[in-house]
């Protein structure tokens, strides 16, 4: 190694002042001085454990010492008698070996491949030792888990990502999936547990042993979110459950993740071979699979958007030409051809890269450049992380750490290092673009006429604009010129750097050319300039519109069609990323896939970072709303489908919010102890109104009530034990808080919980029994009407079944027809007096006579009136299907049901489109006269006449 650079020699004096007496400067070797100057992590470790430094001096690290890790750790654990001792010894062992690896890495005593191998095998050794110790302890406590034949069942652990590939970085978390082979029960314990319970409890203890911070630190941060169904799925799955999931529901991204999956520990046993054989067909297709390229391109686009969202710069992993792009390049060949070429099925990147070159899938030169770049980037990444044992891939901005990295990478200074780094990343980006880059390369438009540039630069006199804007009226021409001038004045007030000005000067002539070709140029330009004012200081978004002409065209057409979309994009410019791919922009997520999409989206956010979780939920919702609105405008979604999508989206949000609130409450108070005897969480969220009726609009709030079914004496099992009814109350309060907290991306939804028993004066959470009693003995008729449009939107099967039974029972109560008719009619008249249209010569689509609410009251009245005789009327909670049921059960003539359905969907469609135009829900008095007359006639027939 070359001598320390001048800044590092100065820093050495600071290090000397920190060292305790046993580590006096004169006693240290030259190598020790180099390593202690480079790594604060090593400094802190040897100050706490001076004997480790003596061991390093007397027994320097060797390339093959990973082969001794298991024996060394076994010796360290030989006297451990409890979990606390296990946790302590694992943490100390990990830190001691990491110091040795950092020493070898800093001094370049071994190759980078050897460093990656040592880091990965250390993690595997610690994971397997912890698992084996806990398995024995759990078997002593609960008995040995066995299958039906009495054969002991092991816990198998899949190491994912870089751990599975033997390429773990210095400060990495570990992605794991737990599995066991066959169902059965424990044998030899004090009481019998089924295998699922045994392995779930053991898995929880294993995560705690590895992940929980103590005074000795932690072993590894454990991430279990790659398992089937993510954090909402079982912690441990049987082989059969794993196989069912990956065959029926496995997603592309899970397939890519599984490429690197490796069984920790003994990987040659019968069960290990069975698991591997089961997973292989999911990962490697028998046919050549070119769909991989587009899927990986989409994943790369997601990563690029994430980099922009989080403002990541100088990131050697996720940035252009970074480590992730090399991984993608290799995975393309593995996933396209791995089913046909077993040699491509390696988990490790470098061996696979050699195979790709040997198969002539790309040039030897490209393979060599990628190999050199990968080793350079991985060494830089590991050195960066070993400074403070910190999980980062972002290059430092401070002079000390820059000097450290330049020295350790064998460069004279930082500019030399970054010059070589840039060259490597440029090579990677070139290969990546050739292989995975967008295959729909945009043909550049012919250069714009000088007039458009002059129009933007304010170099045209008003008379000179006539040829450019000839198709516009004189008033529109003047308005366009005024908008451009006002926009330029607004720019002068903003701090825009030279790069931003340059991008704007390239973008605006293109934008003006497209906008001014439209008949509605003035209106469209006013919406777009309002949006641009909000993003001019964020060059990334300007570059997006400048570099992707298709995105600019989508922006113009959407803003022209809907001021709501224009406002949404202006408030949340992150949504501009959605314009890049028309396949997703105009094709909303499948209605049954919102939960899965959201789960994948949240995987990118630290589970324990509430602020980022809240932000991610809101960003996901805004992006999905944009897609739904775009499809609505394009005419690809009819009104019923718009509401279906908005409702499924809301349910996915409810699911995620309840999950987040539950995790937080359990962490604070423990789990309700009555759940040990039953499946689920003993908690349900019931949706009323538009949510319950599958009829949400773009700005609808959520009408929710919360139910639980805990016994009176139940308590939580945490250290801060509380009554379970109090637990569920705090859970509901937390849910309300998570929905209503305002972040930079707004609130999630307005939530109204006043439909609960006794309204705002009642308890926020009601027991299932109290809810049933209230509905039977105290509820008003209007509350029974509301129940017609109610359904469980989150809840375990037991509580859902209970609510459904109560709902059916209440709706099917015998009612005196005349009394019911009077009560429903009088309630409607009160509402109309209170909420009806106050605008002269206008028709309020929802509240006025002949409008949507009249149709809703007709269906609710008929269900309550006839469900006693026709129980099937209680099946659905949405008006359209209720009208179908009324016709099918001979309550209403089929023609009348069809007429009301058509009127209902027509009026709702108009409300959706008014919302897209940011207009109130009323129209001219002479609109929809035919529909209103038909609704009035039906109202008269059912709710007025005898």
Curated annotation (Swiss-Prot):
<comment type="function">
    <text>Involved in the regulation of glutamine synthetase GlnA, a key enzyme in the process to assimilate ammonia. When cellular nitrogen levels are high, the C-terminal adenylyl transferase (AT) inactivates GlnA by covalent transfer of an adenylyl group from ATP to specific tyrosine residue of GlnA, thus reducing its activity. Conversely, when nitrogen levels are low, the N-terminal adenylyl removase (AR) activates GlnA by removing the adenylyl group by phosphorolysis, increasing its activity.</text>
</comment>
<dbReference type="InterPro" id="IPR013546">
    <property type="entry name" value="PII_UdlTrfase/GS_AdlTrfase"/>
</dbReference>
<keyword id="KW-0067">ATP-binding</keyword>
<dbReference type="GO" id="GO:0005524">
    <property type="term" value="F:ATP binding"/>
</dbReference>
<dbReference type="GO" id="GO:0005829">
    <property type="term" value="C:cytosol"/>
</dbReference>
<keyword id="KW-0460">Magnesium</keyword>
<dbReference type="Pfam" id="PF03710">
    <property type="entry name" value="GlnE"/>
</dbReference>
<dbReference type="InterPro" id="IPR005190">
    <property type="entry name" value="GlnE_rpt_dom"/>
</dbReference>
<keyword id="KW-0511">Multifunctional enzyme</keyword>
<keyword id="KW-0808">Transferase</keyword>
<dbReference type="GO" id="GO:0047388">
    <property type="term" value="F:[glutamine synthetase]-adenylyl-L-tyrosine phosphorylase activity"/>
</dbReference>
<dbReference type="InterPro" id="IPR043519">
    <property type="entry name" value="NT_sf"/>
</dbReference>
<comment type="similarity">
    <text>Belongs to the GlnE family.</text>
</comment>
<dbReference type="Pfam" id="PF08335">
    <property type="entry name" value="GlnD_UR_UTase"/>
</dbReference>
<dbReference type="InterPro" id="IPR023057">
    <property type="entry name" value="GlnE"/>
</dbReference>
<dbReference type="GO" id="GO:0000820">
    <property type="term" value="P:regulation of glutamine family amino acid metabolic process"/>
</dbReference>
<keyword id="KW-0548">Nucleotidyltransferase</keyword>
<dbReference type="GO" id="GO:0000287">
    <property type="term" value="F:magnesium ion binding"/>
</dbReference>
<feature type="region of interest" description="Adenylyl transferase">
    <location>
        <begin position="449"/>
        <end position="946"/>
    </location>
</feature>
<dbReference type="GO" id="GO:0008882">
    <property type="term" value="F:[glutamate-ammonia-ligase] adenylyltransferase activity"/>
</dbReference>
<protein>
    <recommendedName>
        <fullName>Bifunctional glutamine synthetase adenylyltransferase/adenylyl-removing enzyme</fullName>
        <ecNumber>2.7.7.89</ecNumber>
        <ecNumber>2.7.7.42</ecNumber>
    </recommendedName>
</protein>
<keyword id="KW-0547">Nucleotide-binding</keyword>
<feature type="region of interest" description="Adenylyl removase">
    <location>
        <begin position="1"/>
        <end position="440"/>
    </location>
</feature>
């Amino acid at each position: 190694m070359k001598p320390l650079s001048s800044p590092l020699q100065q820093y050495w004096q600071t290090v000397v002042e920190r060292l305790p007496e046993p580590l006096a400067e004169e006693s240290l070797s030259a190598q020790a001085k180099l390593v202690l100057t480079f790594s604060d992590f090593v400094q802190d470790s040897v100050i706490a454990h001076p004997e480790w430094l003596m061991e390093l001096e007397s027994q320097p690290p060797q390339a093959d010492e990973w082969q001794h890790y298991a024996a060394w750790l076994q010796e360290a654990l030989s006297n451990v008698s409890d979990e606390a001792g296990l946790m302590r010894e694992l943490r100390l062992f990990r830190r001691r070996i990491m110091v040795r690896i950092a020493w070898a890495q800093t001094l370049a005593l071994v190759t980078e491949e050897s460093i990656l191998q040592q880091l990965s095998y250390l993690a595997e050794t610690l994971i397997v030792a912890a698992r084996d110790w806990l398995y024995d302890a759990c078997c002593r406590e609960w008995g040995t888990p066995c299958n039906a034949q009495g054969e002991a069942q092991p816990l198998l652990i899949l190491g994912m990502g870089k751990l599975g590939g033997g390429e773990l970085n210095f400060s990495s978390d570990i992605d794991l999936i737990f599995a066991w082979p066959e169902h059965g029960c424990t044998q030899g314990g004090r009481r019998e547990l089924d295998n699922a319970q045994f392995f779930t409890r053991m898995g929880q203890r294993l995560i705690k042993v590895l992940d929980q911070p103590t005074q000795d630190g932690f072993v590894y941060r454990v991430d279990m979110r790659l398992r089937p169904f993510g954090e909402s799925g079982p912690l441990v799955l049987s082989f059969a459950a794993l196989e069912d999931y990956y065959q029926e529901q496995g997603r592309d991204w899970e397939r890519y993740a599984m490429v690197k999956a490796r069984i920790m520990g003994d990987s040659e046993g019968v069960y290990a071979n069975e698991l591997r054989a089961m997973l292989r067909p999911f990962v490697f297709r028998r046919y050549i699979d070119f769909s991989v390229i587009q899927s990986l391109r989409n994943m790369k686009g997601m990563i690029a958007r994430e980099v922009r969202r989080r403002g990541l710069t100088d990131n050697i992993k996720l940035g252009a030409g970074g480590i992730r792009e090399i991984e993608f390049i290799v995975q393309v060949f593995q996933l396209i051809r791995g089913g046909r070429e077993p040699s491509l099925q390696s988990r490790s990147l470098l061996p696979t890269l050699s195979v790709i070159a040997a198969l002539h899938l790309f040039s030897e030169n490209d393979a060599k450049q990628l190999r050199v770049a990968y080793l350079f980037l991985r060494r830089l990444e590991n050195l960066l992380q070993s400074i403070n044992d910190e999980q980062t891939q972002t290059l430092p901005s401070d002079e000390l750490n820059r000097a450290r990295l330049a020295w350790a990478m064998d460069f004279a200074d930082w500019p030399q290092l970054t010059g070589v780094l840039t060259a490597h990343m440029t090579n990677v980006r070139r290969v990546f673009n050739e292989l995975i880059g967008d295959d729909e390369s945009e043909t550049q438009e012919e250069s714009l006429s000088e007039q458009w540039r002059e129009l933007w630069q304010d170099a045209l006199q008003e008379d000179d604009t006539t040829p450019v804007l000839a198709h516009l009226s004189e008033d529109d021409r003047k308005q366009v010129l005024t908008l451009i001038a006002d926009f330029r004045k607004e720019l002068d007030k903003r701090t825009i750097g030279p790069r931003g000005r340059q991008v704007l000067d390239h973008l605006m002539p293109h934008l003006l050319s497209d906008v001014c070709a439209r008949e509605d140029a003035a209106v469209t330009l006013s919406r777009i300039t309002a949006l641009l004012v909000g993003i001019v200081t964020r060059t990334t978004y300007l570059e997006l519109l400048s570099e992707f002409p298709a995105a600019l065209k989508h922006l113009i057409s959407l803003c022209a069609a809907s001021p709501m979309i224009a406002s949404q994009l202006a408030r949340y410019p992150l949504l501009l990323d959605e314009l890049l791919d028309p396949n997703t922009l105009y094709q909303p997520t499948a209605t049954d896939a919102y939960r899965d999409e959201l789960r994948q989206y949240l995987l990118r956010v630290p589970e324990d970072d509430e602020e980022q979780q809240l932000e991610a939920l809101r960003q996901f919702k805004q992006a999905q709303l944009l897609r739904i609105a775009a499809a609505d405008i394009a005419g690809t979604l009819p009104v019923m489908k718009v509401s279906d999508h908005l409702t499924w989206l809301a349910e996915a949000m409810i699911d995620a919010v309840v999950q987040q609130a539950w995790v937080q409450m359990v962490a604070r108070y423990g789990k309700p102890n009555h759940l040990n005897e039953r499946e689920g969480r003993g908690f349900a969220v019931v949706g009323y109104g538009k949510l319950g009726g599958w009829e949400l609009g773009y700005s609808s709030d959520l009408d929710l009530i919360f139910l639980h079914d805990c016994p009176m004496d139940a308590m939580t099992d945490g250290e801060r034990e509380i009554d379970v009814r109090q637990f569920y109350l705090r859970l509901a309060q937390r849910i309300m808080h998570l929905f209503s907290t305002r972040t930079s991306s707004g609130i999630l939804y307005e939530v109204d919980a006043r439909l609960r028993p006794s309204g705002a004066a009642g308890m926020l959470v009601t027991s299932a029994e109290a809810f049933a009693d209230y509905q039977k003995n105290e509820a008003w008729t209007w509350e029974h009407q509301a129940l017609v449009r109610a359904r469980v939107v989150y809840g375990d099967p037991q509580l859902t079944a209970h609510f459904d039974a109560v709902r059916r029972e209440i709706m099917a109560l015998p009612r005196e027809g005349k009394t019911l008719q009077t009560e429903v009619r009088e309630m409607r008249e009160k509402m109309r007096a209170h909420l009806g249209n106050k605008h002269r010569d206008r028709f309020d689509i929802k509240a006025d006579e002949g409008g949507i609410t009249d149709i809703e009251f007709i269906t609710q009245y008929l269900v309550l009136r006839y469900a006693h005789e026709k129980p099937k009327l209680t099946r659905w909670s949405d008006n359209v299907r209720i009208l179908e049921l009324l016709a099918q059960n001979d309550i209403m003539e089929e023609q009348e049901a069809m007429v009301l359905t058509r009127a209902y969907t027509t009026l709702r469609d108009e409300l959706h489109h008014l919302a897209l135009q940011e207009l109130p829900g009323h129209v001219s008095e002479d609109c929809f006269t035919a529909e209103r007359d038909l609704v009035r006639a039906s109202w008269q027939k059912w709710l007025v006449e005898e």
